[in-house]
Amino acid sequence: MPRSSLAQLAPLPRAFFNRDPRIVGRELLGKVLLRREGRAILAGRIVECEAYLGADDAAAHSAAGKTARNAVLFGPPGYAYVYFIYGNHFCLNVSCLPDGQAGGILFRALEPIAGVERMAANRQLEPSQLRLIASGPGRLAEALAVTRDRDNGKDMVSPKSDLRIVDDGFGAVEVRETPRIGITKSADLPLRYIVAGSPFVSGKRYL
């Protein structure tokens, strides 16, 4: 689909995110995460994400209750939750479940499909290094110029949002489930979702 057509697609509705994160995570695979940068469109097909189930999930940021840092997760579904980790990169999530239940999806990897040169430049890479542009949550955020100051609390369902998720009609993908990466609590739960066979997923663990 041409870049201009992607920009004209409506974002996924709030009802899409007002569900169990396990369902949302599986159904996000194959959808397009899109950033508008002025007249430019930066976009990638979602090939990897992780579900966080709310207060009952020991690995979730919401497990210890509501704080100033994680307040977005406790609000309505469909809002961007951005946090800074390891002192060097941001991670982008979207809130799920009804208001107050604090579920979420962490975006882990994209297959770049539009604005590739701009995304590569954001990562200080060449466009030919396609697999490295957004394979991993920190790389993904950097490629789309996501920061906490700019994007935390942003309504990704609003048609006016410069950060949204759209369905371009790509169709069904083969989904694989694996344990989540980089956590020590609830580490055995199969809540990481990947597009089977995609070369753009992060790392090689559980592939």
From Swiss-Prot:
Keyword annotations: DNA damage, DNA repair, Hydrolase
UniProt xrefs under PANTHER family: DNA-3-METHYLADENINE GLYCOSYLASE
Gene Ontology BP terms: base-excision repair
Family, per entry: Belongs to the DNA glycosylase MPG family.
GO molecular function terms attached to this record: alkylbase DNA N-glycosylase activity; DNA binding
Keyword RNA-binding among UniProt keywords: no
Protein name: Putative 3-methyladenine DNA glycosylase
Listed EC numbers: 3.2.2.-
Matching InterPro entries: Formyl_transferase-like_C_sf, MPG, MPG_sf
A Pfam family per the record: Pur_DNA_glyco
